[in-house]
Amino acid sequence: MPFVKDFKPQALGDTNLFKPIKIGNNELLHRAVIPPLTRMRAQHPGNIPNRDWAVEYYAQRAQRPGTLIITEGTFPSPQSGGYDNAPGIWSEEQIKEWTKIFKAIHENKSFAWVQLWVLGWAAFPDTLARDGLRYDSASDNVYMNAEQEEKAKKANNPQHSITKDEIKQYVKEYVQAAKNSIAAGADGVEIHSANGYLLNQFLDPHSNNRTDEYGGSIENRARFTLEVVDAVVDAIGPEKVGLRLSPYGVFNSMSGGAETGIVAQYAYVLGELERRAKAGKRLAFVHLVEPRVTNPFLTEGEGEYNGGSNKFAYSIWKGPIIRAGNFALHPEVVREEVKDPRTLIGYGRFFISNPDLVDRLEKGLPLNKYDRDTFYKMSAEGYIDYPTYEEALKLGWDKN
């Protein structure tokens, strides 16, 4: 793979991106964050982090000391999942492999946070049916799309509107997964309430048409997310917890900017987090997906939403904010955004193809192109074989 063409890098070493910041208990040496990157290399059966490659993959990207790494989305329980090749953190075998990964990250003097991920209607209903598991969402009468509805009915596993007892069970599973993460050596956890997965399905009025205390109003739609946050904070401490949100996202059939009340919904969540913070329970960070990337399967520049921005969050939430979405090819935007001293920048796809991305950002070096075809391929190719800048020069990539 050659370097990215028609891209003029800018050295960002003189910006706030390379100023230290404390996130929870972690003293980061810069503000370029690795956000959660699903890679589908976990081993089936068992949803076990890949024994052959995962340690090396994470160690490569932790090579710059003081880097914050948020792991790929990780299932708290079998019921949370529905993808065979994404990892979990409920079994002894899974925890054993995660322990090795966290150790490798820490040996490079970087930091490991686990993203806790529950799929809901984005799961494969036939995979869940095979394993005797429900196909869950906020409601049972609106599916993610026609294809998912057809799969669910064919598998005799129609979408299930989870009961209040089942919500309580999910909360317990988030708590146990957070405890497992910390026991395995992680520095913290990120609760995934973005990108159309289960917690986001409760936040969005398109997917949530419940009439109980978990639907029907901004406050009720936020209840499940906030219950998870509160329970996990009580279990491991607020300084070890972050929350991810995607106000304008349309991935997995979310409303995004088409929903007129969407900013009010997220402003309420952020306000509740700030209220808790003032009472002594400030989360380590809030992580926002930018309207620049409303759907992670689209390439840079596609699917941008221009009708709003995440700036509203800064006037409500007064803690650190990670912002992720199509920043790597726009260093001029990064230069402006990091002028706010609370801002960190998440770099996703280009951290896949550039294990030394932090060095390249600092010095303004060319970036390796990524190969989208290997994002979710069960192979070492496209996973642990991307070269550093020096290695790429030896391969002649600068001449391609």
From Swiss-Prot:
The UniProt catalytic activity note for this protein reads: A + NADPH + H(+) = AH2 + NADP(+)
Task: Indicate which residues the UniProt annotation says bind substrate.
Answer: 192, 195, 376
Q: Does the keyword NADP apply?
A: yes
Q: Which cofactor does it need?
A: FMN
Query: Which cysteines are cross-linked by disulfides?
Result: none
Which Gene Ontology BP annotations are present?
apoptotic process
Gene Ontology MF term list: FMN binding; NADPH dehydrogenase activity
Q: What is its EC number?
A: 1.6.99.1
Q: Which residues form the active site?
A: 197
Among SUPFAM superfamilies, the record links this protein to: FMN-linked oxidoreductases
Protein origin, superkingdom: Eukaryota
Please give the GO cellular component terms listed in this UniProt entry: cytoplasm; mitochondrion; nucleus
**Keywords attached to this entry:** Cytoplasm, Flavoprotein, FMN, Mitochondrion, NADP, Nucleus, Oxidoreductase, Phosphoprotein
Where does it localize? Answer: Cytoplasm; Nucleus; Mitochondrion
Q: What is its main location?
A: cytoplasm
Q: Which residues does the record give as FMN binding sites?
A: 38, 115, 244, 349
Q: Which residues carry this modification: Phosphoserine?
A: 353, 379
- Show the InterPro entries listed in the entry: Aldolase_TIM, OxRdtase_FMN_N, Oye-like
Q: Any miscellaneous information on file?
A: Present with 15100 molecules/cell in log phase SD medium.
Family affiliation? Belongs to the NADH:flavin oxidoreductase/NADH oxidase family.
Cite the record's note on assembly: Homodimer or heterodimer with OYE3.
The record describes the protein's role as: Flavin-dependent enoate reductase that catalyzes the chemo- and stereoslective hydrogenation of electron-poor alkenes. The enzyme is reduced by NADPH, and oxygen, quinones, and alpha,beta-unsaturated aldehydes and ketones can act as electron acceptors to complete catalytic turnover. The physiological oxidant remains elusive. Has an antioxidant activity, reducing reactive oxygen species (ROS) levels when overexpressed. Formation of OYE2-OYE3 heterodimers contribute to the induction of programmed cell death upon oxidative stress.
> Could you tell me what this protein is called?
NADPH dehydrogenase 2
**Encoding gene per record:** OYE2
